[in-house]
Amino acid sequence: MPTTHDWINNPLGVVDGLFAQSNSSPDWEKKVVEYFKEKLKLNDAHTWVPSLNDVPLHYLKPNSLVKFRCMVQDMFDPEFFMGVYEMNDPTSNSKQVKCGKYKDVTECGQVDFNSRNTVTSERQTFYCVPIPGESNWVKESYAGTSQARVVPSTSYVPNRHKRSYEEDDEMDTQCQQTKDISQGAQSSSESHGNTEPKRQETEAPSQDSSSSHCTSSLDLNFPLPGEKGPACLVKVYEDWDSFKLNDMLEVFGILSVDPALSVIADEREASSLLDPTEGMETMEEQRVHSPPASLVPRLHMLYAQPLAHNNPLLPSSPLENNADYLSCVLGELASVRAELLTFFTHILMGDSLAAEFLILHLISNVYSRRDVLPLGKFTLNLSGCPLSSPFTEHLFKVIQQLVPSSYRLSMSLHNMNTQRMVPRKDYTANRLVSGTLQLAKNTSLFLDETQLEQGQLDSTGVRNITALGNLISWQKVDYDFNYHQMEFPCNINVLIASEGRSLLPSDCQVHLRASLNPPNLEEYLSAVQVAQVPSQLNKYRVYLSVARALNYTISDEITKAVEEDFVDMRKDDPQSMSAEDLHRLLVVARLLSLSHGQNTLSRDGWMKAKQLEALRISRTQQQKCVNGNEP
């Protein structure tokens, strides 16, 4: 059996070994997946696996086991590959049956395309990017817990990347790798009766070099501007229907960075006669779907763990499965909440009411949907933010320090009129072009409306404002497929910072009422941030993630009491409490309970929620009287 680290350094050896033992039994594929799942369960075995998120690609050994924390940005068409093929060995004049799974190119030798042992299989390709807006503290924490032993690969270095697809003459002296694998897979698929026209991998290296891939700029299609990190083509072999667009995953797979992959597009163009479906691909589609492996490596998925969150300070498994951990955290919850409330009060210049609602906003979560109505969302409009000051920038930095993923959108006229927010389908390249609103669940989106100046919104700006409004109201983004729009549900925490009431809808408006007036606002806000030591920040990070993940119920007794209370309030003043007001009050009560670590609503919690909401409404009405013209 493989030694301790053989399954990390040489996973293909494990795969080939299990394939050889199978004697053509179809169960061998399940055994491969189970083998690696069991290995990753041992102690902290997952920390031994190098991560593409924090290890440079040229430090990773080709065909080794790696992991990648990512979001599914796009899903390409299914493709065929040779799952099993037979090789002719001219030296020994013998034949060997080989496994083609988890590989992009065949081994050296001659493939017998007429062999009855050939099996054509199908796989799906996901285009995956790092989780958009992931905070630096998250990346550093994940990297800090890694126990992977990584040394620079001698067979795959940056110079080698460039040479391999530009001017590498050594390719002429290397063994001739099979160029006709696509033709063999095509004829094999025909013999198996697969006539559905699907894109089929050529999977053949070219001995002629081309610099087209390096001279043309490659758009890695990150949703957020300025993002960095690796993008991957993840090859999925089983249960690909269980994955959805925008899912957060931690993928464990076999890294494929063969230089041959960098010229597949050129080879396809030259060999399009071998497969009619190849000729149907445009040059742009080939460029997008077969980028240089040195820039977009391939990752053959063995196992993928859906991520409920990307907070490295919490267990990756659901909290209900970690009773001891949850009990420990809940024991400290009250004190941590009080400290966080004080911290937010200082950041909000002495406004403790706004600090309360900021906590409720940050732990809000769409926990269910009733028809089209998302339940649990709590978009906060923090009005009264000073213009031409560093306040909103510092407020976002504070949030960025506490949540795993976030993004600040400056709502300047230029950004509104030029930024692509809604993803759209590019039919020429056959890919989904990302937009700012293609975000993973539980991302904090900070909309800075104080940057919006007077001017005219063009058609793009109007579409962007509409998209933001739909995101806030319905927690959905309508992706643009040219001839139609397709709804994609989301779960995004939206905070709007504005001077007056926001032009966008919100679930709750709190007008900032500062009781502090520091002579130098920037110095004051910086000092408040610096005063928080890392251990204290970690407590806040755990608190917010745990409170968000807690289950919540309302007993029949409390439900009846709330209904009676609602009837009484309507009797006194029918205009004082609408059904919408009651819904918001119930959301506040839910979040207030969870913020105190209580997973059910009590009478005391209901009364506190009513008091908190009464204070907020009173302040909002006072502000309307002051402004006069504010809606």
From Swiss-Prot:
It comes from the Eukaryota. Coiled coil: none annotated. GO terms for molecular function: chromatin binding. The keyword Hydrolase does not apply. GO terms for cellular component: nucleus. Residues 193-202 have a biased composition (Basic and acidic residues). Residues 148-157, 173-192 have a biased composition (Polar residues). Keywords: Cell cycle, Cell division, DNA replication, Mitosis, Nucleus. Residues 206-217 have a biased composition (Low complexity). PANTHER family: MINI-CHROMOSOME MAINTENANCE COMPLEX-BINDING PROTEIN. Belongs to the MCMBP family. This is Mini-chromosome maintenance complex-binding protein. It comes from Danio rerio (Zebrafish).
